[in-house]
Amino acid sequence: MVRLREIPRTATFAWSPGADSPLIATGTRAGAVDVDFSNETCLELWDLGLSREDVSGELQPAAKIDTDSGFNDIAWTESDDNKRGVIAGALENGSLDLWDADKLLNGSSDSVISRSTKHSGAIKALQFNPKHSNLLATGGAKGELYISDLNNVANPYRLGTAARADDIECLDWNKKVAHILVTGSNAGFVTVWDVKSKKESLTLNNVGRKAVSAVAWDPEKPTRLVTATPLESDPMICVWDLRNSHAPERTLRGHESGVLSLSWCTQDPDLLLSSGKDNRTLCWNPQTGYAYGEFPVVTNWTFQTRWNPHNPNFFATASFDGRISIQTIQNTSTDTAKAIADQNQALDGEDFFAKAQSQPQVSSFSLPKAPKWLERPCGATFGFGGRVVSVGLTEKGSRTSTIKITPFEVDEAVGKSTETFENALKEGDLRSICETRATNAATEEEKADWKVIEALISENPRKSLVDYLGFQDKADEAADSLAKLGLGKDEDVNGEPAKESRGPGAKKHKRLQSMFDANPEGDSFLSDLAASKGAKTNNPFQIFNGSESEAEKGITRALLVGDFEKALDVALKEDRMSDAFMIAICGGQKCIEKAQEHYFSKQTDSPNYVRLLASIVGKNLWDVVHNADLSNWKEVMAALCTFAEEKEFADLCEALGDRLEEQVRSSDEKSARKDASFCFLAGSKLEKVVAIWIEELAENEQKAIETGANDTTFSIHVHALQSLIEKVTIFRQVSKFQDTEHTKDSDWKLGMLYDKYIEYADVVATHGRLQVAQKYLDLVPEKHPEAEIARNRIKLAMRQAAPQRTQTTAPATRATRTPMGRPMPQPSAYQPQSTFAPAAPAAPNTYAPPTAAPNPYAPAAPAAAAPAPPQPVNPLLPHRRMAVFLLLLRANNQSPATVTTYTTATNLPAWNDLPEGFMKPPTSRRATPATAAAPITSPFPNQSPPIGHGPPPPGAPPTQRTPSVPPPPKGTAPPPRMSSPLAGAPPMASMAPPPAAAPAPAPPANPYATLPQSPPMASSMAPPASIPRGPSPYNAPPTAPPPSNRYAPSPAAQAASPQLQTRAPVPPPPQAAASPYAPQPMAQPPAANPYAPSTPPMVAPPMQQGPPPPQAGGSRPSTANSQRKAAPPPPKYPPGDRSHIPAEAMPVFEILSADMQRVKSRAPSSFKAQVDDAERRLNILFDHLNNEDLLKPNTIADMAELARAIQARDYDTARAIHVDIMTNRMDECGQWMVGVKRLISMSRATP
């Protein structure tokens, strides 16, 4: 709440009508005494200047005129004859004065319009008709009620003729029916008048005829109104429906003293202001009786409050402390008030009184829903994933809305083409995709790209690339040339030409082997030759004939001994190249390479094909790639496809493409870019070809825009982007591309492609194709910052509700019930058996559920009664008697409960019920001590008393009847709980009672309050019986570290006393004063806690000088060695990361975090530490969910059900699931379970 302005007057006031800058008219309140004891009375007009930021200094009146009497009421209405309207004043001397507001502001001396003195006494109230602004109703002493017409003020007419002894204190015109008026008197009469017929319609049956100080009509329902009583003994506001005038429909109780003023907001009937003698101004929902909260408290009575008629964001409140406060209904932080409080704390001594600043008490609140004038009747917004969310009223005039989610696509063609392409990919027909895209290509470059990709799909990609370059036809032409030279003909032995075969495939064999295909005797040649191997020929020769040169002799000798390498050296030395090649063929690969090297070294001025041949033979195609003229790039590419080794092919293609790309940059020759793209495609260099494609994308997009196509710029860009993504996708599949940089966190070679993937994913996601978007985002490195954000959005948009948990029969640990009466003792599953019964620990059990539900409505409890004097221990208790007691106790547990004095809860929805959700405990300045309730013998009022033997010991508290408990607030009752074993059994007469204990703390009045700690018990004394008390959902966790054994009792239970001492009976637990607004306590005792140390059987512990030795396996103080544990493995993801939470666990994170934020925003600031601790523990749970560790799938499903129960405010189900998880799955629990438990309690206590 922001206090915008303050008018330093004790005066009644009225807001100016109309939409102009708001003004306020004030009239000195009759009977009020100013600070300076001045008796001056006047009418003043104030310009609030709400548009001004500078609010320093005190407001000064814009106009002022003295009057001869004080004001009881004032009104301001619009008028056709007066520019700024007419102001009417109800004066204490019985005069009705009218002023022209415009003349007052201008300082004119004739601002008084008229004066009427028809009233014989003081005029207490007046109001202009909201439908007819010329009609003015005035009411005052002796029941006088007049209706005046501004056109004839001197002749008003009176409603009701009989003289009355009571005074009309308030009146109000009906907001829907113009001729209906209601009045309230100090005698308790609430009368409805029909002004048209000038008679009384009906009188409400105001029980007890309590005085009425204010009345107000419902602005929308003409039959509903509210009344207020100024009595300090019974302050209340009654909501009436004229259709049942015998009793109020609802009573609103929140004020501590009489109510003096009401103001019902005309723009929102769910907002009602009330102010009164308790110095407070409250805001209500009169439709439900719920009190939203309280505005800052002042130091004296607040006698008038009014909404601004035009802008209800503002309202004003007048009080007898000499101020009229103009405030907003919006809540803001109280940093200023805190700063002043801190400053005052630093002052001491006389400086405090000299320098301390006063600040009104602040009690801020926020409206749970927006006021009606701020509500949007309709609205729409675009949602991620191709959705439009629209909101509209179900019917005109209602406040219920319908939410619709409809699919939306910016460009339907994008969605259709995306689906078509993805379906084609699933079918795997890549060739048809390439053919279709090549046919529909808009540019030659795009068509060439698709043709090359199509060539790469074939079984022999290199041959297909050569064919695409056009070298297949050139090879055929070469074969034809050989045929023309005669190399293609052959003759048989008879000299006749061979017959050629000219079949369909004959053209394919026009190389050297084709010369033998036409010889019909070719197949028998080898067989004939083999048959003639042993035949002698008539052709003798000499190895040496004497005419040989030395070189020839050396070659011959080397050949005879098989030394081909020496023979080759001689031939090369003599430059006999033909002989050298023949010898090299016989000598093997080494000789061949030597001959080739010698040959190429001699060919310095040889033709170009020789250099090409040298590169091919030497397997060094880099010379061709780096040095060949780029005009012959196709020939170079053909050579690479034909002769390059597989491991070098990609790099050779990249080098050739780089040369072509460099040529594009140096000469700006765009045609070479297509050639470079071919090389990069052939070499499967995606990072290089993508850069070209992205450059082409921008150029093609610009051309399409310049050509004036009908498509929008968005559609043009998306289609170009889609074409790029399709080419990249097909190329990756064809080339089997593997991204080796997917794990890097920066400096990616494909960085530009990743950006396009992210952009395309966003486009297809906005068209509703979330699966496709996720597919392409998965191709982007995980550590890409923009991709991570996009993935999270896609993941959230694709999340699915967790499967519903099958409802099965609840295990016994979750819903164990006992017969009505005293609960059965339940042995702990983790308590070791011992013949020694230790004293119950004095420390509270942090895992035990509370013994009673917190009561946010109960007043503070009184101090407990003084404990009874101690009683000596009887060490001679017979064992037989104790056994009889245990048998009787067990039998009593199984017997039905005795009849208790609980009041039956009622649930009346409308009449005479109390306001829901609001009952403020009295403040300290008006608090009165509550009367202590009678003590009870058991902490559970409906528990049967145990059967004892003999009269109670002296000094034992007498048994008294449990006081009746009023009905609970609306809502279903929580399920019954189990009780800890024998936690509440009273001491037997023959047993040694526990020692006297200090009074236990009372249940807190504030649902967020931290419970005061109990005084410490003696180390060896048993604690008193359990006391039902309401725990605060914001209590901090126990600070003491838990024992190493999670089933061991708390540290307080481990302390042993050297000697037992005398004990006294248990003092009765303190009970809060019976509150008529408190909810009814639970009918069943609280559930047993399987993790708490079990309470020992109810037997007197034997006398001994020290504790017994610890049992084997029991809890021992942990040593340094036992506390050393292996360091846990590092988490998979850093704390706070929520992007990897699986879909089935997402509801847990979303619902619990949202509810935690709701609680955090509404919890009292004094409990910030407790709320932050609960939030920290919930974040531990979310980290486990994000890392997918600790929690198993069934536990995650249970947690999802628990979250949905919290969302539905079904806290009993949520707590039952929580207990079940803690009971049966302790290995999955940790610190986060305490946070979940706290959230359940906080959420239940937070409105």
Swiss-Prot record:
GO terms for biological process: COPII-coated vesicle cargo loading; endoplasmic reticulum organization; protein transport. One of its GO terms (molecular function) is structural molecule activity. InterPro entries: SEC31-like (IPR040251), SRA1/Sec31 (IPR009917), WD40/YVTN_repeat-like_dom_sf (IPR015943), WD40_repeat_dom_sf (IPR036322), WD40_rpt (IPR001680). Residues 487-502 have a biased composition (Basic and acidic residues). It is a peripheral membrane protein. Its main location: membrane. The keyword Repeat applies. It comes from the Eukaryota. WD repeats lie at residues 5-47, 66-109, 118-158, 163-203, 207-250, 254-294, 297-337, 381-406. Residues 798-823, 837-850, 921-939, 979-991, 1045-1064 have a biased composition (Low complexity). Residues 942-957, 964-978, 992-1006, 1030-1044, 1078-1111 have a biased composition (Pro residues). Residues 487-509, 798-854, 908-1141 are annotated as: Disordered. Keywords: Cytoplasmic vesicle, Endoplasmic reticulum, ER-Golgi transport, Membrane, Protein transport, Repeat, Transport, WD repeat. Component of the coat protein complex II (COPII) which promotes the formation of transport vesicles from the endoplasmic reticulum (ER). The coat has two main functions, the physical deformation of the endoplasmic reticulum membrane into vesicles and the selection of cargo molecules. This is Protein transport protein sec31. It comes from Aspergillus terreus (strain NIH 2624 / FGSC A1156). The lineage of its organism: Eukaryota, Fungi, Dikarya, Ascomycota, Pezizomycotina.
